[in-house]
Each structure stands twice: as structure tokens, then as C-alpha cells.
A protein has these predicted regions:
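Pyridoxal 5′-phosphate
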Residues: 1-178
Length: 178
């Protein structure tokens, strides 16, 4: 829930992590090597102040919503609602182990033998629904699933999605598949 490129590093005491980049630190600006003390040892160049502020705001937001588990529960609820609706649509192929509780809010599917990019485009053009079609950087998975030609359409439900949006997606898929 923060800007891309922000994060943290937890290192156990006694572990030596060598700097991967060298550059000014603002503390020892004329030294060619990184300082030995932490955290400046790993902070070459200018710190990403905007990213750090954004990450802090993201963490505050997570806390205000009741924590990561509360957010994940909402997202899983949306995915389960979506699955319950699309399972009833003829021609929808779902990919995943759905005999267990939904572990993430990502659902991958296909509509008949239509190429995933065509489905994704139709969802965006007709209903304003953004999905991710294709191979998702997982060619071996697609070989195992037999979806190399078609790819899959990936729905990713997030905290700001609503039940109404899920219902719209189900209706849209019904229109496309029926």
C-alpha cells in the first residue's frame, strides 16, 4: 500500500550485508566507499523521501482499516462472491484449486476458446472493467494448463472494489459467454 520501489530490509545481528551500490550519502559525501555504520552503509545516493512518506501513509491506512487481515478478508470476500457467480456461467473455465478457501483475491479464467486479450478488451470497452490478460510471466504454467495460445484473464480484487463492481463483472462475463 505504498509507492512502488519502497520497502524495508530486516537483517539479523551479526549478518554482514555488503553495499550493492556506491555513492554519496550526504554524511560522507567525499568518501569513495560507503560508511561502515548502519543504515547509511546501504543508502547510496539521495533517499527516496517521497516514497518513504508514501509508504508511511500506506501503513497508516492499513492500520486504520483494522490491519492486513481485515483488508485481506474483504478482498477474499469479493473473490468468493465473484467465483460463486462465474461458476454458474456456461463456457467459463476457471484455473486454480477452488476446493479450498480462497487464499488470495486473484481469479484467472477464460471464456470458451476466445483469446484472453479479446475478453479483456471487451470488458474494458463495454463495462470499464480492467483485467490483465496474457501469460503473466509464467510460460511454464500456461504450458501445464494448455493455455499457451489463449492465455488467461486475471481478475484482481482489491480493498477499494465493491460488491456492486463484482456483480457487474459477473454480468459482463455472462453477456460475453452466453
Amino acid at each position: 500500500m505504498g509507492p512502488q520501489g519502497t520497502g524495508g530490509l530486516a537483517v539479523a545481528e551479526g549478518i554482514d550485508v555488503a553495499p550493492w551500490a556506491m555513492g554519496g550519502t550526504g554524511v560522507h559525501s567525499f568518501d569513495e566507499l560507503q560508511p561502515l555504520e548502519w543504515p547509511t552503509r546501504l543508502e547510496a545516493g539521495t533517499l527516496n523521501g517521497h516514497g518513504i512518506a508514501g509508504l508511511s501513509t500506506g501503513l497508516d491506512f492499513i492500520e486504520a482499516q483494522g490491519g492486513v487481515e481485515a483488508i485481506a478478508a474483504h478482498e477474499r470476500s469479493l473473490a468468493e462472491r465473484f467465483l460463486a457467480g462465474v461458476r454458474e456461467i456456461p463456457g467459463i473455465a476457471l484455473y486454480g484449486a477452488f476446493d479450498q478457501p480462497v487464499r488470495s483475491a486473484i481469479v484467472s479464467l477464460n471464456v470458451a476458446d476466445i483469446v484472453s486479450a479479446e475478453i479483456s478488451d471487451a470488458l474494458m470497452q463495454g463495462w470499464g472493467i480492467a483485467t490483465r490478460p496474457g501469460a503473466h510471466c509464467a510460460p511454464l504454467m500456461h504450458r501445464a494448463l494448455g493455455t499457451e495460445r489463449q492465455g488467461v484473464v486475471r481478475f484482481s480484487f482489491g480493498y477499494f472494489n465493491t460488491d456492486e463492481e463484482v456483480d457487474t463483472a459477473i454480468d459482463a462475463l455472462c453477456d460475453l459467454a452466453c
